């Protein structure tokens, strides 16, 4: 059994109750520049943040100092699906916090964390791992991997979803997200996508926005 932890940060002068919060789900290599970037921005807007660490509590996700030895097995073993489960856990935990407004809990995720933020809205996954009666108020996946099709992945909750991707992202194909959004819109869902021109993966960070190797195909290794 894994124990996953997170850090709850309240903005300056936050109220004693009914504070909105955004759950932050990190990418493959853990909490880094992109996640810290959004933590600061969200807190500056008067919104609390809950930074989930999905790596350190998992046997195959414990990273060494140079991020090369074990971290790759985290993605290989879980393919980001653990972010979905962690997102549900964070939602349940925060909904019972005395200072948090349970109806204003949002989610933002980067890369593999964005997969969690995107697909935790799938009703089938919610039935498997979520808590009945609890949904996120909003979902913001940043450059998510949409290049895997799941059974009934067009049957989602009514949570508004806003996807952000770079036009030149070769790490995860942009077209797959555009097509997924079109499929969800055809179902009448509140989903939209923003494609930023001349930008790559992790485009919002100082060290990101660079060209990655192109992934030609993808095998998730497991069935969900």
Predicted regions, residues:
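Serine-hydrolase catalytic machinery in alpha/beta-hydrolase-like enzymes
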Residues: 1-4, 17-96, 207-224
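Glycine-rich His-Gly loop
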Residues: 24-30, 114, 144, 166-167
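Conserved alpha/beta-hydrolase "acid-adjacent" motif
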Residues: 170-179
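Primarily recognizes the serine-hydrolase "nucleophile elbow" in alpha/beta-hydrolase
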Residues: 45, 78-157
